[in-house]
C-alpha cells in the first residue's frame, strides 16, 4: 500500500472550511484589500461603510455592504479570524442556505438598530459615533443565538470557566481591542442575536423545506460542486449524520491511519485442551500465567503448547482454576471425567504429536 504524497497529507490535515464562510472572507478581501494595500494613507472614508448621512441620500446598499469594509490591515486580519471562527461554526450548525439567510437578516437589522442609536446619540449630543464596518456585528448576533440555545451551561473563556450566558458580554468587552470597530454596532448585533435566540423573531426563520429547495438552486448548486470547500446541507438529518461521522470516524479515515497498512497480529497461540483435544483459550507470547496444580471438576485437563523452540515439540501444563472455570461452565462434582465444552468426547490419543501428560492428583 503506497503512502500518500505530501500534497494529499497537507489537504487531509487542513480543516474543512464551509462554503459560505469562505466566500464571505473572500468578499471582505476583495472589497477592502485594494484600498488597504494599493492606496497610500491617509485613506478617505469608504463609500460602503454605514452612516446616517448616506441613508439620507438613499444609499440603502450600505445596510449590507458595511460588513465587508475594513479600514486597517489589523482589523482585516481580525475580521478574517472572526469570520472563520464564528461564521464557520454557525454555518455548520444551521446549513449553508440558512447561514446566508441569517447573515443577511442580522446584517440589515443590526444596521437599523445601529442607526436608531446613532440618531438618539446625535439628538442628545452625546458625541460622534464611529461608522459601522466589519463583520463583528453579525458575528455577535450569531454568538448571541448560540449562547441562548446552547445546552452547555459553562464555557472556557481566556482560560477561565464562566457561565455560557456571560460569554457574549465578555467578548463584547474584548472587541474594544479591535481597531476601528464600532462598539455600538457590536451591541446592536448582540441584541438581535439574543432576541432571535429567545424566539422573539421566530417569524423571520427559514423552514427546512425551503432550505432544501434552495439547495438545488443557483448559486448554492454551484457552491455544492466546489470540492475544496464543505457545503453544509439544509437537512438537519444530514448534518447530524455528518457530525456523527466526525465524532466516530471510520477506520483508516485519518491520514495517520491511511498511511500504514492494516496488519493482522499473528501471535503464537498456547492451546488449552481437555483430554479430547479441543482448543479452549489462547495466550500471547510472554504472558503465560503461572499455573499451580489444580484438580478440575471434569477430570484431567492439560495445556499443550505447540509453539516451543521446536515446532514439532509440545509441552503440557496443568490448567489453572481460573482458566478452567472461565472457559467451561461449572460441572457437578459427582460427574468426574465429563467434558462440558459443548461437545462430547472420550479420552484417547491427542494426535500424532508427542506430548507428556501430567495426571492431576
Swiss-Prot record:
Source superkingdom: Eukaryota
The entry's keywords: Golgi apparatus, Membrane, Transmembrane, Transmembrane helix
Residue span of region Disordered: 265-287, 318-361
Annotated effect of mutating residue 185 to L: No effect on cis-Golgi localization
Pfam families: Rhomboid
Topology of the protein relative to the lipid bilayer: Multi-pass membrane protein
Record GO terms (molecular function): serine-type endopeptidase activity
Membrane-traversing stretches: 19-39, 63-83, 100-120, 158-178, 182-202
Comp. bias regions, Polar residues: 267-276, 318-328
A single cellular component GO annotation: Golgi apparatus
Compartments (UniProt record): Golgi apparatus, cis-Golgi network membrane
Tissue localization of expression: Widely expressed, including in retina and brain (at protein level), as well as in kidney, testis and ovary. Expressed in all layers of the retina, including inner segments of photoreceptor cells and ganglion cells (at protein level).
Subunit structure: Might form homotrimers; these trimers are only formed in retina.
Record-stated family: Belongs to the peptidase S54 family.
UniProt protein name: Rhomboid domain-containing protein 2
Amino acid at each position: 500500500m503506497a503512502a500518500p504524497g505530501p500534497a494529499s497529507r497537507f489537504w487531509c490535515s487542513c480543516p474543512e472550511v464551509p462554503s459560505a464562510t469562505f466566500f464571505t472572507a473572500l468578499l471582505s478581501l476583495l472589497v477592502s484589500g485594494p484600498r488597504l494595500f494599493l492606496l497610500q494613507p491617509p485613506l478617505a472614508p469608504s463609500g460602503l461603510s454605514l452612516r446616517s448621512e448616506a441613508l439620507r441620500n438613499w444609499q440603502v446598499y450600505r445596510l449590507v455592504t458595511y460588513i465587508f469594509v475594513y479600514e486597517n490591515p489589523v482589523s482585516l486580519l481580525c475580521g478574517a479570524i472572526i469570520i472563520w471562527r464564528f461564521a464557520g461554526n454557525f454555518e455548520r450548525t444551521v446549513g449553508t442556505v440558512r447561514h446566508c439567510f441569517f447573515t443577511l437578516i442580522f446584517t440589515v437589522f443590526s444596521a437599523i438598530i445601529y442607526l436608531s442609536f446613532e440618531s438618539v446619540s446625535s439628538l442628545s449630543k452625546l458625541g460622534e459615533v464611529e461608522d459601522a464596518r466589519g463583520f463583528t456585528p453579525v458575528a455577535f448576533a450569531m454568538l448571541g443565538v448560540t449562547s441562548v440555545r446552547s445546552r452547555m451551561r459553562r464555557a472556557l473563556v481566556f482560560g477561565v470557566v464562566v457561565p455560557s450566558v456571560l460569554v457574549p458580554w465578555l467578548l463584547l468587552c474584548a472587541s474594544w481591542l479591535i481597531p476601528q470597530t464600532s462598539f455600538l454596532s457590536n451591541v446592536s448585533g448582540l441584541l438581535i442575536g439574543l432576541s432571535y435566540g429567545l424566539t422573539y423573531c421566530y417569524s423571520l426563520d427559514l423552514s427546512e423545506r425551503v432550505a432544501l429547495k434552495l439547495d438545488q438552486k443557483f448559486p448554492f448548486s454551484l457552491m455544492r460542486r466546489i470540492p475544496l470547500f464543505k457545503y453544509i446541507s439544509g437537512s438537519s438529518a444530514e448534518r447530524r449524520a455528518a457530525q456523527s461521522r466526525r465524532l466516530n470516524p471510520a477506520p483508516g479515515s485519518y491520514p495517520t491511519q491511511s498511511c500504514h497498512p492494516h496488519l493482522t497480529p499473528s501471535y503464537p497461540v498456547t492451546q488449552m485442551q481437555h483430554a479430547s483435544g479441543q482448543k479452549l483459550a489462547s495466550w500471547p507470547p510472554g504472558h503465560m500465567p503461572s499455573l499451580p496444580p489444580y484438580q478440575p471438576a471434569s477430570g484431567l485437563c492439560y495445556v499443550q503448547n505447540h509453539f516451543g523452540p521446536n515446532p514439532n515439540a509440545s509441552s503440557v501444563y496443568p490448567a489453572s482454576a481460573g482458566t478452567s472455570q472461565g472457559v467451561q461452565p461449572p460441572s457437578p462434582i459427582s460427574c468426574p471425567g465429563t467434558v462440558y465444552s459443548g461437545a462430547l468426547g472420550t479420552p484417547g490419543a491427542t494426535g500424532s504429536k508427542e506430548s507428556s501428560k501430567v495426571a492431576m492428583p
